[in-house]
Amino acid sequence: SPCFAILKRATRVFPLSHYIETGSMTVAQAELLRSAIAERRNILVSGGTGSGKTTLVNAILDEMVRLGEPSERFILLEDTVELQCTAENHTALRTTRHVDLATLVKATMRLNPDRIIIGEVRGREALDLLKAWNTGHPGGCTTVHANNAIAALQRLDQLAQEAGVPSQRALIADTVGLVVH
């Protein structure tokens, strides 16, 4: 029988303080996230479908804008409009039937990005993102479907290998600064 999904974009961004107030996050966890953001570490958010990965990434984006320099240039890449960024200097690029995320990541390098954010990595674009983050563009964030933090790193490696390369564990270790599950 027919089936379809309706994705409803959030009407507001819940800041990290909301996570603390509702007991979803401790003060120490929020401070760890803030520290990672301030130190421009790349953040990988993992979880299952509907677990709140994108909602948390929007909170992280909000914190990046709050803690960062007004001149920071954010490039947001996604296939479905879900990310919300209040930065004055941001550009959102979307996939099309003819342009995939891997192509967008490569194009992003010509846009002088300070922070590269991908809504969700699902394929070979993982390798391009890791390379971009590791070549002068730290401080990004993305999501991946995984059952725990270790599985998230393994999944990122599997996705990078879809580009036809061997395991990228060393690159992942050098590039990903924090995994949130």
Where in this protein do the model-derived segments appear?
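P-loop NTP-binding catalytic core
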Residues: S1-E39
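Switch/coupling sub-region of P-loop NTPases
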Residues: A30, I37-T49, T55, A59-T175
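Short, well-ordered beta-strand core segments
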Residues: V179-H181
